[in-house]
């Protein structure tokens, strides 16, 4: 039985990743972490562990302790913020993971949109709103809506607002 550690397992991405694993096979023992004790309840995992935030200096050490305790075969960091920290510390991680170098992980949603667009991948029409005065011009340019206003960085739909 393979043992997988899913960080951020309580967020929608983590929940969906775990569901996909369970559809594929029941031969996984899944340890899930999340810093939010309430979100942690959402995932269908075998072991729940409240974690420090990815910005905590002890985050990598925390993951290594879990890896050792549960004999984890693979770490899947779900939110991009945690993937970035783990990618920056690949030499310190004591088990397998599949991550690109930190310079490849973009946490800037606008930059990600530009990269995807240049690769020919369809993306939503995107405009930057730098100040309050630009809002009316954006609606004139894009039409009446609905439109999403999003923060450039963050996870879990943080600061998302649907506007009509």
What are these regions (language model features)?
Residues 1-4:
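Extreme N-terminal starter segment of soluble prokaryotic enzymes
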Residues 10:
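N-terminal Rossmann NAD(P)H-binding glycine-rich loop of SDR-like oxidoreductase domains
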Residues 14-25, 67, 87-90:
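Surface-exposed amphipathic alpha-helices with a cationic face
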Residues 29-31:
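Conserved beta-strand positions in the Rossmann-like core of class I SAM-dependent methyltransferases
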Residues 33-39, 80-81:
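Short, polar loop motifs at secondary-structure junctions
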Residues 38-41, 135:
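Short, charged/polar "capping" segments at the starts of alpha-helices
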Residues 42-128:
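Conserved N-proximal alpha/beta basic substrate-recognition cap immediately N-terminal to
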Residues 103-164:
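Active-site nucleotide/adenylate-binding loops and adjacent lid/helix of ATP-dependent enzymes
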């Amino acid at each position: 039985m393979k043992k997988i550690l899913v960080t951020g397992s309580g967020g929608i991405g983590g929940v969906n990743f775990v569901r996909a694993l369970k559809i594929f096979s029941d031969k996984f023992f899944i340890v899930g972490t999340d810093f939010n004790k309430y979100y942690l309840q959402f995932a269908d995992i075998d072991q729940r562990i409240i974690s420090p935030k990815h910005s905590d200096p002890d985050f990598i050490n925390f993951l290594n302790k879990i890896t050792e305790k549960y004999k984890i075969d693979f770490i899947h960091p779900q939110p991009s913020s945690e993937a970035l920290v783990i990618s920056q510390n690949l030499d310190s991680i004591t088990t397998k993971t599949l991550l690109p170098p930190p310079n490849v992980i973009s946490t800037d949603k606008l930059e990600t949109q530009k990269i995807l667009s240049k690769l020919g991948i369809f993306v939503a029409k995107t405009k930057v709103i730098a100040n309050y005065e630009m809002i009316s011009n954006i609606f004139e340019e894009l039409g009446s809506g609905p439109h999403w206003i999003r923060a450039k960085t963050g996870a879990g739909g943080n600061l998302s607002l649907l506007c009509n």
